[in-house]
C-alpha cells in the first residue's frame, strides 16, 4: 500500500497596523527646549565641580604651612627667635670649585708627557685584577713594552719599518696628519698671525676704493648742465647722412679725344637696312621635317557605326552565329579651304 503523505499548506503570518507612522508623533517637543535643558545640565555640573577644586587647593596650602612651621636658628646662635615670627631659610649656593685659577700671566705652559715603558712596568696595575693571565693559564706578560699600559692606547705588534730600521714610532705633535693633536698655543699663534694680515689687506682695499671714488666723482665747482636736444626729422636725417661712411665707386672717366678708328654712320642707311630685314624673312627647316608631306582633312572622322547584333541560338540550338556582311560606307571628301567654290559665302 502506498503511504499517504499529508501536504501541509503554506501559512503566512502578519499583523495589521492602523497607522504605521504613528510612532513618530511621540516626540512632539520643541528642539529649542531640548537644547536649553542640555545647557542647564552643563551649568549644574560645573557648579558641583567648583567646590571640589577649592577643597583640593586648601589641602595643598595646609601641607605647605606645616612645612613652614619649622624654624631654624641662625649659625651664630646669639640671636633669639621671637614668637610669631618665622625664620626664612636662605638657599645655600653650592658651587663646584676646581683647582686654583691662574691668570693669563700665571698660566703654566701646556705640555704633553709620554710615559716610557720603564714607568709602566714599575707602576702598580690599576683596577680590580692584576696582569693578564696570572691564574691557572700561566703567567702573562705585557704585549708591547713600547706603549702605554694595557688599558690605554692599543699597540700593535708590528709597525711599518720600525723593527727593521730600528726607529721607534713617536707621537706627532707638529705638522699635519693623523694622530697629530698639536698644542693650544700653536693654534692661538696662528690666529694672531693671520688676523693682522687680514686687517692690513682690508685697509688697503678700502683706501683704493676711496681713491677710485674720488677720481670718478666730478668736482663740486664744476656744474654739469644737461639739456635735452630737440630737432626735426629732416635735421636728424641730415646728421645720420653726415655720420654715414661714404661709398667710393671706381668710375672710369670718359675720354674726350676721338679714337682713330671711329667711323660716322648716317641714320638713313640704317633705316633702309632695317626695312629690308623685315621683308626678307626666311624660316629654316630641318632636312628630316615630314610636316610638309602630311595631308590634313577637316570634316567628320571615319567612325564605324554600330551594326545589328547577330542572332543567338536558343536553348538547345547551339549553332554558331553567321557573321553579317557590312556594306562599305562612302564618305564625302572634306572641303578645300583654298577653293572658293567650297565656300561661296566668302566669295
Curated annotation (Swiss-Prot):
Cellular component annotations (GO), alphabetically ordered: Cajal body; cytoplasm; cytoplasmic stress granule; nuclear speck; nucleolus; nucleus
Keyword rRNA-binding set for record: no
Major localization class: nucleus
InterPro entries linked to this entry: HABP4/SERBP1-like, HABP4_PAIRBP1-bd, IHABP4_N
Key words of the record: Cytoplasm, Nucleus, Translation regulation
Compositionally biased tracts (Gly residues): 307-319
Compositionally biased intervals (Acidic residues): 199-213, 338-347
UniProt-listed GO biological process terms: positive regulation of RNA splicing; positive regulation of translational initiation; ribosome hibernation
Ranges of compositional bias, category Basic and acidic residues: 61-71, 83-107, 116-125, 146-174
Stretches for region Disordered: 39-221, 298-347
Record localization: Nucleus; Cytoplasm; Cytoplasm, Stress granule; Nucleus, Nucleolus
Subunit-structure text: Associates with ribosomes; promoting ribosome stabilization. Interacts with eef2/eEF2; promoting ribosome stabilization.
Similarity comment: Belongs to the SERBP1-HABP4 family.
Biological function: Ribosome-binding protein that promotes ribosome hibernation, a process during which ribosomes are stabilized in an inactive state and preserved from proteasomal degradation. Acts via its association with eef2/eEF2 factor at the A-site of the ribosome, promoting ribosome stabilization in an inactive state compatible with storage. Plays a key role in ribosome hibernation in the mature egg by promoting ribosome stabilization. Ribosomes, which are produced in large quantities during oogenesis, are stored and translationally repressed in the egg and early embryo.
The protein, known as: Intracellular hyaluronan-binding protein 4
Upper classification of the organism: Eukaryota, Metazoa, Chordata, Craniata, Vertebrata
Amino acid at each position: 500500500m502506498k503511504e499517504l503523505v499529508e501536504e501541509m499548506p503554506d501559512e503566512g503570518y502578519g499583523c495589521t497596523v492602523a497607522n504605521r507612522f504613528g510612532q513618530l508623533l511621540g516626540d512632539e517637543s520643541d528642539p529649542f527646549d531640548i537644547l536649553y535643558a542640555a545647557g542647564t545640565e552643563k551649568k549644574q555640573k560645573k557648579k558641583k565641580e567648583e567646590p571640589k577644586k577649592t577643597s583640593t587647593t586648601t589641602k595643598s596650602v595646609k601641607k605647605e604651612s606645616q612645612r613652614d612651621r619649622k624654624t631654624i636658628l641662625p649659625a651664630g646662635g646669639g640671636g633669639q627667635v621671637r614668637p610669631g615670627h618665622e625664620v626664612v631659610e636662605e638657599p645655600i649656593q653650592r658651587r663646584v670649585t676646581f683647582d686654583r685659577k691662574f691668570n693669563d700671566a700665571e698660566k703654566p705652559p701646556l705640555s704633553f708627557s709620554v710615559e716610557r715603558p720603564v714607568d709602566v712596568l714599575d707602576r702598580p696595575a690599576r683596577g680590580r685584577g692584576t696582569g693578564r693571565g696570572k691564574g691557572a693559564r700561566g703567567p702573562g706578560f705585557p704585549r708591547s713594552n713600547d706603549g702605554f699600559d694595557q688599558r690605554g692606547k692599543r699597540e700593535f705588534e708590528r709597525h711599518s719599518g720600525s723593527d727593521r730600521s730600528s726607529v721607534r714610532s713617536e707621537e706627532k705633535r707638529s705638522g699635519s696628519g693623523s694622530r697629530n693633536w698639536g698644542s693650544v698655543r700653536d693654534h692661538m699663534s696662528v690666529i694672531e698671525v693671520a688676523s693682522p694680515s687680514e686687517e692690513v689687506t682690508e685697509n688697503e682695499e678700502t683706501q683704493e676704493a676711496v681713491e677710485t671714488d674720488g677720481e670718478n666723482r666730478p668736482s663740486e665747482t664744476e656744474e654739469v648742465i644737461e639739456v635735452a636736444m630737440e630737432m626735426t626729422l629732416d635735421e636728424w636725417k641730415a646728421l645720420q647722412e653726415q655720420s654715414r661712411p661714404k661709398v667710393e665707386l671706381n668710375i672710369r672717366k670718359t675720354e674726350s679725344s676721338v679714337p682713330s678708328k671711329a667711323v660716322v654712320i648716317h641714320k638713313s642707311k640704317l633705316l633702309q637696312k632695317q626695312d629690308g630685314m623685315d621683308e626678307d624673312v626666311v624660316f629654316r627647316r630641318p632636312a628630316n621635317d615630314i610636316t610638309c608631306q602630311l595631308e590634313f582633312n577637316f570634316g567628320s572622322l571615319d567612325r564605324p557605326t554600330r551594326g545589328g547584333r547577330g542572332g543567338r541560338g536558343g536553348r538547345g540550338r547551339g549553332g554558331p552565329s553567321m557573321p553579317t556582311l557590312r556594306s562599305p560606307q562612302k564618305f564625302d571628301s572634306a572641303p578645300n579651304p583654298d577653293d572658293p567654290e567650297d565656300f561661296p559665302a566668302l566669295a
